Curated annotation (Swiss-Prot):
Amino-acid positions noted as binding [2Fe-2S] cluster in the UniProt annotation, renumbered to this chain: C93, C99, C105
Subunit-structure text: Homodimer.
Keyword Lipid metabolism: no
Descriptive protein name: HTH-type transcriptional repressor NsrR
InterPro entries in the record: Tscrpt_reg_Rrf2, WH-like_DNA-bd_sf, WH_DNA-bd_sf
Job description of the protein: Binds DNA; this binding is disrupted by nitrosylation upon exposure to nitric oxide (NO) and also by EDTA and iron chelators. The 2Fe-2S cluster is stable in the presence of O(2).
Organism phylogeny: Bacteria, Bacillati, Actinomycetota, Actinomycetes, Kitasatosporales
Keyword Transcription annotated: yes
UniProt domain HTH rrf2-type: residue ranges: 2-132
Domain of life (superkingdom): Bacteria
Keywords on record: 2Fe-2S, DNA-binding, Iron, Iron-sulfur, Metal-binding, Transcription, Transcription regulation
UniProt remark on cofactor binding: Binds 1 [2Fe-2S] cluster per subunit.
Gene transcribed to yield this protein: nsrR
């Protein structure tokens, strides 16, 4: 299975937000974009989607920035990926040139099952799990600002 670049970006953004230490200022979207190595506009779209899912909170103004919500810390990565990827199937059997086998195709069902197995493998994981050592310290090292 292959994730879209958007889902990859959203997950990496969440992972960076998950390692903010006590006393650190919340990160701005621009900082998240720099850390994960994408243009600001791409990061902003991903952050907006994560806000709509309720896993990121954004506050404007002085003392503002991005924070991971409680839901964001405990939600399943499988659920996040399903939400970010949407209803897309592994193969597009309908599209502009519909497959003549689509009504009786066993491959389509097998690919759907494989896709669900992929998501199910991510279900036991949370974003907090993803940033356990050695990942968390590496993420913290990508930000060039002092703690506190």
């Amino acid at each position: 299975m292959r994730l879209t670049k958007f889902t990859d970006l959203a997950l990496r953004s969440l992972m960076r937000l998950a390692v903010v230490r006590d006393g650190d200022e919340p990160l701005a979207t621009r900082e998240v974009a720099e850390v994960v190595g994408v243009p600001y506009t791409h990061a902003a779209k991903a952050i907006t989607r994560l806000q709509h899912l309720g896993v990121v909170e954004a506050r404007r103004g002085r003392g503002g920035g991005l924070t991971l919500t409680d839901l964001g810390r405990r939600v399943s990565v499988g659920w996040l990926v399903r939400e970010l990827e949407g209803e897309a199937e592994v193969v597009d059997c309908e599209g502009d040139n519909p497959c003549p086998l689509r009504g009786a195709c066993r491959l389509r069902r097998a690919l759907r099952d494989a896709q669900e197995a992929f998501y199910a493998a991510l279900d036991p994981l949370t974003v907090t799990d993803l940033v356990a050592a050695p990942t968390g310290p590496v993420l913290l090292g990508l930000t060039d600002r002092p703690s506190g």
